[in-house]
């Protein structure tokens, strides 16, 4: 029996949940039929438990809707479908004891000694919230059981949300538990630079031996490998060697692995072998906690109402939040004035003005209305003519894409529409982008306008 019902179920779940939730928990699931039982396969126990707790009842409901009596039972367990054998022959690394003639000595050996870890980035200084709870929990599991818990661990999310902090925290924890461990943190561009240097100095075997001898390899911004075929080839073999030796790999990216254009499919597939978790923009309470925690680290007493004021106005990411706090502390230090809401408003005048221009549902509605030459009131109305329905659907889809609002909240902003109306709008926009080149161009133009 086919798994068509599961594919239909996935299509609806993708519309109902955020991209981060869908990509982290639902997209990695594989399905197969055993007589009249649908079996979902998850990459590890962590995913199994989370799906059971948060998504399973909805999955059962949708499967019953799409399959009728064809599927009698649904279960989820750890496992994976068989994967094709690697089609790349194993590499032979020439060692110093080889009978092959020695190459000329490198002009200058690459410095591999430092772990490049920032000792300030530890789990204790990472403020936990709903937006990063899962990523932090998974990171702590990896730190406690490197090479065993989730391998590789792939953390993705926007700029300044704490991915690098978690990566350093894992590395520091591994070294604390085992000072003899060989741990290396680096940006993906450093890996490329090391490889190029090794090629230039005829020391590629030394490069391979070093990277494949690590106990933990932590690579930041893996998306920069995109389009670099030789680097991807070398990393592919390094990845395989480390996993075969049960050594830990931790990767970060600004997007879900399957969405990294220019990355080989075999690499993207391997990125999903362990656990993929998202770090989302922090909610208000977490932003307040971050500000108070950072102020305490600087021996500054930050009034709660001031922290709340800053957190409410600066919503994009942790990095900008910390930057704003540093500016406030510096201004207070140089002027000798107490930190009050009025003082903060003056110290952050330009930054707050910029934040006020960030995308909101109201901004989206206004921009879409102007683009299509209709009134905002039309978008909020119940009118169903195509000239109004299309812009309304576009505005709803853009609101889901560009804001952190839930589907019910988006519906409320459009004249109290039901969340199912928003789901339908998002699905319709996705179809039109594929089938209508003019509509697709409109979507690109509006995304560019709203993102600039």
From Swiss-Prot:
In which compartments does the protein localize?
Answer: Cytoplasm
Q: Where is this region: Domain III, AAA+ region?
A: 116-332
GO terms of biological process kind: DNA replication initiation; regulation of DNA replication
Instruction: Quote the Gene3D superfamilies the UniProt record gives.
Output: 1.10.1750.10, 1.10.8.60, 3.30.300.180, P-loop containing nucleotide triphosphate hydrolases
The GO cellular component terms are:
cytoplasm; plasma membrane
GO MF entries: ATP binding; ATP hydrolysis activity; DNA replication origin binding; lipid binding
What does the entry note on its domains?
Answer: Domain I is involved in oligomerization and binding regulators, domain II is flexibile and of varying length in different bacteria, domain III forms the AAA+ region, while domain IV binds dsDNA.
User: HAMAP family in the record, alphabetically?
Assistant: DnaA_bact
The similarity annotation says:
Belongs to the DnaA family.
Q: What does this protein do?
A: Plays an essential role in the initiation and regulation of chromosomal replication. ATP-DnaA binds to the origin of replication (oriC) to initiate formation of the DNA replication initiation complex once per cell cycle. Binds the DnaA box (a 9 base pair repeat at the origin) and separates the double-stranded (ds)DNA. Forms a right-handed helical filament on oriC DNA; dsDNA binds to the exterior of the filament while single-stranded (ss)DNA is stabiized in the filament's interior.
Question: Any idea what this protein is called?
Answer: Chromosomal replication initiator protein DnaA
Q: Which organism is it from?
A: Legionella pneumophila subsp. pneumophila (strain Philadelphia 1 / ATCC 33152 / DSM 7513)
Gene that produces this protein: dnaA
